[in-house]
UniProtKB/Swiss-Prot annotation:
UniProt KW Lipid biosynthesis keyword: no
SUPFAM superfamilies from the UniProt entry: omega toxin-like (SSF57059)
Annotated coiled-coil segments of the chain: none
Organism annotation: Conus radiatus (Rayed cone)
Name of the protein described by the UniProt record: Omega-conotoxin RVIA
Protein role: Omega-conotoxins act at presynaptic membranes, they bind and block voltage-gated calcium channels (Cav).
Localization (cell): Secreted
């Protein structure tokens, strides 16, 4: 999974925690 702070898309679940919609980053 992607570590916190990594860029992500809210529609994908590849973060270790969750993708934050306000900054489009994990964690």
């Amino acid at each position: 999974c992607k570590p916190p702070g990594s860029p992500c898309r809210v529609s994908s679940y590849n973060c270790c925690s969750s993708c934050k919609s306000y900054n489009k980053k994990c964690g």
